[in-house]
Amino acid sequence: MITVTGTRENYIAEMTADRGTLNATHCDIPVEQGGQNAYMRPGETLLSALGACMNITARKYLNRDGLDYESVTVKAEMAR
């Protein structure tokens, strides 16, 4: 389960996963929308999850097939 917590003070949201000791991650919105612009926006976090999934899947197949690589980079962008 994912837990997202926010306070009245600002629009920063803290997200944690209930799988033991994991680091929390945060989201925020731009200053002009009332946030602090201290963390990624929610849409960027969603896009990051997709990019991480693609990156891990690519490396999984490279490892499975015994292909040599130094790193895998995924770049993603979204239109608003």
Language-model-detected regions and their locations in the chain:
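Extended beta-strand/beta-hairpin segments
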Residues: 1-48, 58-80
